[in-house]
Amino acid sequence: MFKCGGVEVQYRNFGNTGIKVSALGFGTMRLPMFPNSNTIDQEKSIELIRYAIDNGVNYIDTAYSYQDGQAEIVTGKALKNGYRSKVYLASKAPVWEYNNEYDFDRILAEQMRRMNVNQIDFYMLHSLDANFWDNKVLKYNVLEHLYKAKRDGRIRYIGFSFNDDFDMFKWICDYWEHWDFCQIHLNYIDEEYQAGLRGLEYAKKKGMAVNIMEPLRSGYLANVPKSTQIVFDEICAKPVEIAMQYLWDKEGVSCVLSDMGSFEHINQNLEYAKVSSIGMLSGKRIMAIKKAQQTYINSRMIHCNGCYKCNCCPQHVMIPRNLEAINKIGIHNSVKIAKEFYDGSVALVGGSATDCTNCKWCESICPQHINISHWMHKLPELIK
């Protein structure tokens, strides 16, 4: 337990590694950017990362692909001046970039140069699904290279992040005996989605640590519809508080990752993390979550989790924000809210759905297999 300014961060077992990590981890997928720009505000981002570390967060999660590679660079800078020794550093290998057996070592070396480190504590194969598993991991003997990197000290622990169904998750877990941990998409809306609760339980039984990504479902669970907010108000709880506690309540969860873009966001999550514990949910809160689940099930239009893997459109369509605009129609039961979001976050800065040429490149890499081109052409009609 770490205390700073009255804040106490709880630590949890990281599978069978013997390591304890903070219940709250700092994700770098959405570091703050300059207005109307794709460039990270490095000074602000470094301040945020170091502030979280100073207040007890000891798990920093980044990836080769986050924010076009900028996230790893900024993370490395944030860990200078003694901060590297205070944290466990996690990053991910972009398996989709592998085209031969040499690419693993080349890309890992590039990542280590970006972050200016000689070792990565937790290294994951990023976004595994059946396609990447067969056509990248197995085809190019990636597991052999991964284990060699562990043996020679470039990485300490081996894992994977996941974007497919439970059967594929189980297959990957069972295929290789050297997995130390995994990272899955889980929140109170998506209990049966991808690996889901079954995946959490299965990994726990195998002694693997389990990190959670998308605890707030890309912000959807932070800005709940009025009907859900009323339910939470009745038990004097905030939406983010409920979403995080839902996960910390579960024994198999090692660390809940949050992309924190402001000091306010960090402080809020720290306050929730300091009271986190297994089995913490009361009966009233469990019932409130069940009601919230039903509300979302009845209102969603597209099962997009905002992973941003499609945000490299050849026509520069800002696909995630366009999809978010569509989902706001159902979640908030309001075309007005959806149009205001679209006008302010898409039309104003460029990347409109109307620029879609139906090339379907985005659909080939979407982990959720969304018919994106269909929705891009439908969006203007939905919000007019």
Spans of features found by a protein language model:
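Conserved, mostly hydrophobic/aromatic
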Residues: 14, 26, 45, 52, ...
